[in-house]
Amino acid sequence: MQQTKKLTHSDITIAVMSGPFLQRGEPALVSKWYRTKMALACGVDLVVELPYAFSTQKAETFANGAISILNALHVSEICFGSEDGQIENFYNTISVQKNEEETFNRLVKQFMNAGNSYAKATSEAFLHILSSEKNIDMSQPNNILGFQYIKAILMQNSSMQAQTIKRFASHYHDETFNDQHIASATSIRKQLFSENSSFTEIESFIPKATASLLASYKQNYGTLHNWEQYFSFFKYKLMTMSPEDLRHIYEIEEGLEHRILSKIQTSSSFHLFMEALKTKRYTWTRLQRACTHILTNTTKEEIYCANIEQHAPYIRLLGMSQKGQTYLSKNKKKIELPILTHTKTFDHPTLHIERKANSVYFSIMKEPLRTQLLKRDATHHPIRYDETTAKFL
């Protein structure tokens, strides 16, 4: 965050944040409201939500939704972390892909026909048409997402400029702590759910406010969220579904329904299920997203009605600093998308999916807490933060 501010000389900082489920197809550790507090305490001025219909998607759709929201908010610059760290290389890669589009598409098809996942086929196709010096490594997750951010900016004819910060020491998927002060999201998650884990083991890797809020969430609600806690719900749902039922679920394609229904029969945990389910053709992340759509009962028809090929249909405001509130007040008339401070009365197909996702997210809580949290989510107004006193209002 501090590096971003230093690089962009920004007046205000806006974060677009996923809701209950994330791009890798897994539940967020804590609710979006606690994560909003974390962001505000770390220097973000406006926190807005990326709807489920965009957030639990491949990089291209995820980026398209995020950029459309930032564009609507009249953001002048976007900054993202990447393994490459040189913004010129991203533009070079996009240019090469555009110039070699026919060859690129042919290679992707060729590698997919050989049994590779779309992500792997894309990465291999890039390796064949790009020289490594001035182009990015498209096998790296943050490079892929950054590439799609810039593509979305160009496709939406936005005047937004892009900047990138190089990720050091730790890669996104690293499962262990390889550095004294920098750790991957994956390694932090793994540590939090290990036996006899404590927050002291991750304190040197995350901001103090974040550690405090994580501990507070676990103390108040008795748990952090991961896939294993939803597995009994997930397995029950699958055991009551037919292949035809499953084919209606978003991202269930090419006979995947039969493999899912076969592997669930003998799986006693989500991790074991995923180990049995994964193939060369389907990445772990792609399968986790499909599982998330099964859990939330998100159908192809619902995603079609949400019209995700276009921009996000609204801006759900989750939190703001005093500076962020001033920015919104000054620019409100210029912002074309409706800004939602709660969702109780707003109606849209995208929001229907969102409500289901929230219901599922809180399903692991005991009653009456579960019902209270779900009701509160729809009526919850944006969290306000006074950055001069470092206090929530």
Curated annotation (Swiss-Prot):
Top enzyme class: ligase
Disulphide bonds in the chain: none
Main location: cytoplasm
Location(s), subcellular: Cytoplasm
GO cellular component: cytoplasm
EC number: 6.3.4.-
Keywords for this protein: ATP-binding, Cytoplasm, Ligase, Nucleotide-binding, RNA-binding, tRNA processing, tRNA-binding
Reactions catalysed, as given in the entry: cytidine(34) in elongator tRNA(Met) + acetate + ATP = N(4)-acetylcytidine(34) in elongator tRNA(Met) + AMP + diphosphate
PANTHER family linked: TRNA(MET) CYTIDINE ACETATE LIGASE
Family: Belongs to the TmcAL family.
Protein purpose: Catalyzes the formation of N(4)-acetylcytidine (ac(4)C) at the wobble position of elongator tRNA(Met), using acetate and ATP as substrates. First activates an acetate ion to form acetyladenylate (Ac-AMP) and then transfers the acetyl group to tRNA to form ac(4)C34.
Name of protein: tRNA(Met) cytidine acetate ligase
Organism of origin: Bacillus cereus (strain AH820)
Source lineage: Bacteria, Bacillati, Bacillota, Bacilli, Bacillales
